[in-house]
């Protein structure tokens, strides 16, 4: 194997994004994925909603971070996203930690745009104080997979599981190793 500066283990979102980021910064990168394709586990099958922070009404810092991350993601990967006609958030009438008006007030104070569609739902639900529709997006996992496959094909080794001994050898050879696997 040729000497590389950075070894990244895991070909999901984190591994692929970090690989691209380090390459853009001029580093030499080797990406290893244990499966026969990148994006073949959670990064492909997750709901992949790109959210603005609507589901964090009790955490202002998290809403701010979500909005910042949303803008950053769209600046880098806008071609990998699609608009959603419906992106609904509902507040329960009973057993909720927050009432609808407080929720809407908090969301408005964070400058998040939404439409209250509580009275115009095309279906009936019980125990709802209200429903809002937002302008969030979804990440198209098929587009993302193809994008990263095309852009990382020259540095990606698929079908290769990296074990602890491999990591030790990479480090001994002077590589920086970043483990981007899930639940390891």
What feature does the model see in each segment?
Residues 4-30:
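N-terminal Rossmann-like FAD-binding beta1-loop-alpha1 element of flavoenzymes
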Residues 10, 33, 92:
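Short beta-strand/turn micro-motifs composed of small residues
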Residues 14, 37, 183:
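Conserved Rossmann-like nucleotide-cofactor binding loop
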Residues 23-45:
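Glycine-rich FAD pyrophosphate-binding loop
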Residues 47-130:
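Dinucleotide-binding Rossmann-like beta1-alpha1 core, especially the glycine-rich loop
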Residues 133-138:
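Glycine-rich "substrate-gating" loop/helix at the edge of Rossmann-like oxidoreductase active sites
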Residues 139-184:
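Predominantly flavin-linked oxidoreductase catalytic cores and closely associated redox partners
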């Amino acid at each position: 194997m040729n000497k590389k500066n950075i070894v990244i283990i895991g070909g999901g979102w984190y591994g692929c994004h970090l690989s691209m980021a380090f390459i853009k910064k001029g580093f030499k990168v080797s990406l290893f994925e244990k499966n026969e394709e990148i994006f073949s586990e959670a990064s492909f099958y997750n709901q992949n909603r790109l959210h603005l922070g609507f589901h964090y009404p009790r955490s202002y810092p998290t809403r701010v971070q979500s909005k910042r991350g949303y803008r950053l993601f769209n600046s880098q990967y806008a071609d990998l996203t699609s608009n959603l006609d419906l992106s609904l958030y509902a507040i329960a009438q009973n057993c909720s930690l927050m009432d609808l008006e407080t929720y809407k007030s908090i969301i408005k104070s964070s400058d998040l745009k939404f439409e209250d569609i509580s009275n115009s739902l095309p279906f009936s639900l019980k125990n709802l104080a209200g429903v809002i529709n937002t302008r969030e997006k979804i990440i198209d996992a098929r587009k993302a997979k193809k994008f990263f496959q095309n852009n990382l094909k020259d540095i990606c080794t698929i079908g290769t599981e990296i074990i602890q001994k491999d990591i030790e050898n990479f480090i001994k050879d002077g590589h920086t190793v970043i483990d981007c696997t899930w639940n390891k």
